[in-house]
Amino acid sequence: EFPYLITPLDAITARAQEDGTTVTSSLSDSDTARAAQIAAAADVAIVFISSDSGEGYLTVEGNAGDRNDLLAWHDGDALVQAVADANENTIVAVNTVGAIITEAWIEHPNVKAVVWSGLPGQEAGNSVADILYGAYNPSGRLPYTIAKSADDYPAQVLYESSAQVPDIDYSEGLLVDYRHFDANGIEPRFEF
């Protein structure tokens, strides 16, 4: 519950009004044909994708609670693909609580940039617009390693268990996150 929220669309639209450019948007994450149509007519296309925690307080795509995979919600991969197929200057903005697998689109030749904003808060719009317009240079540091495949991570989603609360023995010791990748010779998509 924010006292106010500045969305990326609001902030980018305000910047566009200042410099005389035009913003056309689609707020549907499932209408990939419309997104591609808008993108085809634009000089630059910005695609926002997300994945939240769940934590039992919401249900998304039939999943109540924690994420059950490392994919963008609402078929975000298809949305990015459709927009990138239509626009040679596509920027992907990712709002997510943790890593998602980006392999479906990260090597697309029209994806020119990725802005990984994580959970930017009530000033989300201004922070993303500042980066996109070059007012600030993002740090380029991630708080975690992003893999190329969910199988690259040591722990997998436990879909079923006979135990009320599964036992976790943490046998990996200090080999968590980037240490796991280094120790096992796994090349991540984006390093910690």
UniProtKB/Swiss-Prot annotation:
<keyword id="KW-0378">Hydrolase</keyword>
<dbReference type="InterPro" id="IPR036881">
    <property type="entry name" value="Glyco_hydro_3_C_sf"/>
</dbReference>
<dbReference type="InterPro" id="IPR002772">
    <property type="entry name" value="Glyco_hydro_3_C"/>
</dbReference>
<comment type="pathway">
    <text>Glycan metabolism; cellulose degradation.</text>
</comment>
<keyword id="KW-0624">Polysaccharide degradation</keyword>
<dbReference type="Pfam" id="PF01915">
    <property type="entry name" value="Glyco_hydro_3_C"/>
</dbReference>
<comment type="similarity">
    <text>Belongs to the glycosyl hydrolase 3 family.</text>
</comment>
<dbReference type="GO" id="GO:0008422">
    <property type="term" value="F:beta-glucosidase activity"/>
</dbReference>
<keyword id="KW-0326">Glycosidase</keyword>
<protein>
    <recommendedName>
        <fullName>Beta-glucosidase</fullName>
        <ecNumber>3.2.1.21</ecNumber>
    </recommendedName>
</protein>
<keyword id="KW-0119">Carbohydrate metabolism</keyword>
<keyword id="KW-0136">Cellulose degradation</keyword>
<dbReference type="InterPro" id="IPR050288">
    <property type="entry name" value="Cellulose_deg_GH3"/>
</dbReference>
<dbReference type="GO" id="GO:0030245">
    <property type="term" value="P:cellulose catabolic process"/>
</dbReference>
